[in-house]
Amino acid sequence: MAQGDPSMPKKCTALIALPALKAHWLTGIGTVFKTYIMYSGNPSSYNEENSAKLGEIWNLPFVKGKTKLVLVDALYTLCDKGPQPDPRYKWAYNGLIAGTDPVAVETVSLQILNEKRKAMRGEPWPLSPPPLCVEAADKMYKLGTSQMKEIKIEHFGWKQDLLL
């Protein structure tokens, strides 16, 4: 489906979100909740301090309730300076993150980014700006859970460098 044309998701009865795992210099994280931003009519209104509003895009009438699967490409990820690739911050995570709860998938994605950033610096290295959209999608927009302890994670494959 061509991104940006709001008539496209209107025609669909089901959507699959296929974002890549990456940090974003305007929203902290640029993975799940930015998937449908081009359909919002005003993408720039969701950047920086307004990034907490990204969840409202998932409640637009032509998107709400249609996403049946979120599949994050975490094969080769970006933990800073995104969305443009910067080789200093790319690494082969070699994973896929799948789920039906977009907030849970974004929470797991955020956990992986934060753990990689901590491993790179040897100390906590918070995303900047902070990814306000994750907790807001849970608390304000009721799209799922942002509490890691409530998320059931099933691992398949190797466990080395899992960061979870």
What are these language model-derived features?
Residues 1-164:
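Extended, low-polarity segments enriched in aliphatic/aromatic residues
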